[in-house]
Regions:
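C-terminal catalytic domain of Rieske-type non-heme iron oxygenases
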Residues: 3, 45, 76-250
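A basic- and aromatic-enriched beta-loop-alpha substructure that forms the phosphate/nucleotide-
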Residues: 66-67, 90
């Protein structure tokens, strides 16, 4: 078993995404977190079990938002609450994992950088000459121990698949733990609602990470006739009913 001595207690006492839940089977699968070798597998009852390599004692774990969460320490609370995920008209769009040769903290910082839009996501999330980052509000919400940035806005030529042209997009950023951050942005088809983009960062080594981005987007493509079916499936999921489903078969 690899030592976790290089990881301080503050980093150990966090919840981390380490894999997509659909990629975990009954066969033990190696993984790595904070320089520590792990194994993950599904137990006979479908429960995901995460252990340190060479140690049969199960680590705390959760299956949440389509991902496996675990910790090497004692987190002060449960993983981040994302209430929008329970909304029936949301599309679940996983976009990873992506191996990044950088510190997990740097990956989060890059995600929070508005200024890169016109230069990295040219003609999609930004374009010259619209390069100015306008003033916005940043605060640490001590009562929930989160960092929030609000009143962010940026001109975007193609802010979303549902956008029909360039719009000034409103943003909110939410950092819920050192390696978990969420972005809320204007949804072109739903006034007063937000598309939600999450970045769950898995620090593998001090200078290597796996990024697990996922989007929960308001769905314009689901036919009205299917909305009842979608809601029924979500209701079953809330109750934990899986008998006869593809999830159970896996």
């Amino acid at each position: 078993m690899t030592s976790t001595a290089t990881a301080e207690k503050a980093s150990l006492d966090q919840w981390y995404v380490i894999d997509a839940a659909c990629d975990v089977t009954s066969a033990p699968k190696p993984n790595r977190l904070l320089s520590c070798d792990l194994e993950e597998k599904r137990d006979h009852d479908g429960t995901i079990v995460v252990t340190r390599k060479g140690d049969r004692s199960a680590l705390p774990s959760r299956e949440l938002y389509g991902y496996v969460w675990t910790t090497l320490g004692v987190p002060p609370s449960e993983p981040v609450d994302i209430p929008e995920v329970a909304e029936a008209d949301r599309q679940y769009v996983p976009c990873g994992p992506i191996v990044v040769r950088a510190s997990g903290l740097r990956v989060v910082e890059n995600f929070l950088d508005l200024a890169h839009f016109p230069f990295v996501h040219t003609d999609i999330l930004g374009a010259e000459p619209h390069t100015e980052v306008k003033p916005y509000k940043v605060e640490i919400r001590r009562e929930i121990d989160e960092v929030w940035a609000t009143q962010c806005e940026f001109y975007q030529p193609q802010a979303a698949m549902t956008a029909t042209g360039g719009i000034v997009t409103q943003y909110m950023y939410r950092v819920t733990s050192p390696f978990v951050t969420l972005l809320y942005k204007t949804c072109p088809i739903a006034a007063n609602r937000w598309d939600v983009i999450c970045l769950f960062v898995q620090p593998v080594e001090p200078a290597e990470s796996r990024a697990h981005p996922v989007m929960f987007l308001i769905d314009q493509t689901t036919p009205r006739a299917d909305i009842m079916s979608v809601t029924y499936r979500r209701w079953l999921k809330e109750k934990g009913v899986t008998y006869g489903t593809a999830e159970r078969a896996a």
